[in-house]
Design a protein with these regions (language model features):
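Thiamine diphosphate
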Residues: 1-292
Length: 292
């Protein structure tokens, strides 16, 4: 699955107003499609919601085999299996998409992607309780922990345009590791401190002067909440650092020195903020930390 290292790709999305990361992902797909002629993909009957259409590229069919948009129908498991098959065939770069809560149906094939070293990209939108009118059946809770528990799968939950760009560049550059992009339905404001450091999986997005007394760690839609909480705590005289953790797996791939610089052991007061299950955050917050 050799490919160009798109992590050095200079084109990053710009964001001037609040926008959903699913929409930003759709823009990134349409930026990358010209850079990756073999890029092909689609959704399990949720294309308009997942924002996965490549504009002007036509629909794949028996009559139009050159079409780059695949309509898989309501069959998430088969879709992911087909995605693996496309990648194993070679010459093409595939992505598949559905609602995040339906990653339960995708999981067996995602596990095979990870086992086989197939760098398929999973676009998973509507990532928390902010899913609209569908209610609890469509509200993912434990799915994020489930995917993060899978060896050789990178799970990216970006907070804005910059991090969404980093997520797609990481996915497009991967040679042996599949990537899951976990994206919002609701609009998120751009975060001033977000940067290409997101390519490292975790980084300081908003810092204080000197040594922090408290570290707030968040991903996706909760990064904005962490930044707002920092402002309130600092108004009370507390030194706070905010760490954005869009991809735990990538963060763990960084050097011990880098990880220590971002999350110094000496700072034991830590709070993780994420609108899903707290499972998996213990290694970052420690025994003295908390989860919201």
């Amino acid at each position: 699955f050799g490919c160009r290292a798109y992590t050095d790709f200079e084109v990053m999305l710009e964001q001037e107003k609040p926008e959903a990361t699913r929409s930003l992902s759709g823009k990134m797909i349409n930026l990358l499609k010209d850079e990756i002629p073999g890029m092909i993909g689609g959704s399990a009957d949720l294309g308009p919601s997942n924002k996965t259409e490549m504009k002007g590229e036509g629909d794949f069919s028996a009559e139009n085999p050159a079409g780059r948009n695949i309509h898989f129908g309501v069959r998430e498991l088969a879709m992911a299996a087909i995605g693996n098959g496309i990648m194993l065939h070679g010459g093409l770069r595939a992505y598949v998409a559905t609602f995040f809560v339906f990653s339960d149906y995708v999981k067996p094939m995602a596990r095979l992607s990870a086992l086989m070293g197939v760098p398929l990209t999973f676009v998973l939108t509507h990532d928390s309780i902010g899913v609209g009118e569908d209610g609890p059946t469509h509200e993912p809770i434990e799915q994020l922990a489930m995917l993060r528990a899978m060896p050789n799968l990178r799970v990216f939950r970006p907070c804005d345009a910059t991090e969404t760009s980093a997520a797609w560049l990481t996915a497009a550059s991967s040679e042996k590791t599949p990537t899951a992009l976990v994206l919002t339905r609701q609009n998120l404001a751009p975060i001033t401190g977000s940067s290409r450091e997101a390519l490292k999986g975790g980084y300081v997005i908003d810092d204080c002067e000197g040594t922090p007394e408290v570290i707030l760690i968040a991903s996706g839609s909760e990064v904005e909440l962490a930044v707002k909480a920092k402002a309130e705590l600092e108004a009370e005289g507390t030194k706070v650092r905010v760490v954005s953790m869009p991809c735990m797996e990538l963060f763990e791939e960084q050097s011990a020195e880098y990880r220590e610089a971002v999350l110094p052991r000496a700072v034991r007061k830590r709070v993780a903020i994420e609108a899903l299950s707290d499972f998996g955050w213990g290694k970052y917050v420690g025994l003295d930390g908390a989860y919201v």
